[in-house]
Amino acid sequence: MTNIRKTHPLLKIINSSFVDLPAPSSLSSWWNFGSLLGVCLGVQILTGLFLAMHYTSDTATAFNSVTHICRDVNYGWLLRYLHANGASMFFICLYLHVGRGLYYGSYTYSETWNVGILLLFAVMATAFMGYVLPWGQMSFWGATVITNLLSAIPYIGTELVQWIWGGFSVDKATLTRFFAFHFLLPFIVAALVMVHLLFLHETGSNNPTGIPSDPDMIPFHPYYTIKDILGFLIMLTALSTLVLFSPDLLGDPDNYIPANPLNTPPHIKPEWYFLFAYAILRSIPNKLGGVLALVMSILILAIVPILHMSKQRSMMFRPLSQCLFWLLVAILFTLTWIGGQPVEHPYIIIGQTASVLYFLIILIFMPATSLMENYLLKW
């Protein structure tokens, strides 16, 4: 008799995705981050749901409702910090996942890659709107500064910003709609994840060598389910340690001050996971130019498949490209550091240099190095 998991209409979908899925035998721990992101999304939706039961999206009570959650709700402090630090863990896994894709050439699966870029934008939008909800100083001023960037769009900019605000400044209408979208977007993200997996399972997974692995496949369960569970345990241990020992490590102290439109914080900055893009934005003196650079810093991922010039897919056997890749990682760390610094010498010039190098490496140096490596292969 055939196993029910192979015949039942619902179970056979799960079976073909997580049990009998043929997977390359050589997948390293860098392939764990997809499942870790799934766990992060689950944790965020669950903690967010319980937080939404106690949160009020009104400018008069939002800040106090968050205080009430932390002080009066049973384990409310745990929910709040799991949600806030869960977002940080989400982005750590996201950036490592994208980095893995760049290093091992996974971007050649263009449909999966493009849906992944959409997912990245959706998660960034969700995180930005979530940061506004506690209605602290950095929430308010971060929302004001970032939404104001849209006013750089020619002709319709000002009207667009006022339409998003629901008035002439960030106020009650803005907070209410941001809460509505912050609640809705994770479910759209979950739907996009399904599409992401659908496209991935059409082609099968890439592997560290970048060589087709059709002759050497193993079932996903038990090999990679066990490996993923180990990943879950490590990540949840790290998250628990962060939440229980230093929950405010990655937050901004200014957000413990209630939002005040009459008092601007000395340094307005977003959460740490947006600092690299914020540094690129600040590096360009022109407003519209800065906004374009900000969008392009993420959107540039969409043209990476077109810029792939190498005869080899993965960087595993391409030492010159590896050097450039790690230089790019160092530049992203530099940009993240610069984004958190005040706009003064020498930070301005460091930020501008790092921003130019970021785009140069992706657009020119990497394709040129790939062509050079192709030439060296003939020797």
From Swiss-Prot:
One of its GO terms (biological process) is mitochondrial electron transport, ubiquinol to cytochrome c. Heme b b566 binds at residues 97, 196. Gene3D superfamilies: Cytochrome Bc1 Complex, Chain C. Heme b b562 binds at residues 83, 182. A ubiquinone binds at residue 201. This is Cytochrome b. The keyword Transcription regulation does not apply. Component of the ubiquinol-cytochrome c reductase complex (complex III or cytochrome b-c1 complex) that is part of the mitochondrial respiratory chain. The b-c1 complex mediates electron transfer from ubiquinol to cytochrome c. Contributes to the generation of a proton gradient across the mitochondrial membrane that is then used for ATP synthesis. Its main location: mitochondrion. Pfam families: Cytochrom_B_C, Cytochrome_B. Its cofactor is heme b. The cytochrome bc1 complex contains 11 subunits: 3 respiratory subunits (MT-CYB, CYC1 and UQCRFS1), 2 core proteins (UQCRC1 and UQCRC2) and 6 low-molecular weight proteins (UQCRH/QCR6, UQCRB/QCR7, UQCRQ/QCR8, UQCR10/QCR9, UQCR11/QCR10 and a cleavage product of UQCRFS1). This cytochrome bc1 complex then forms a dimer. Heme 1 (or BL or b562) is low-potential and absorbs at about 562 nm, and heme 2 (or BH or b566) is high-potential and absorbs at about 566 nm.
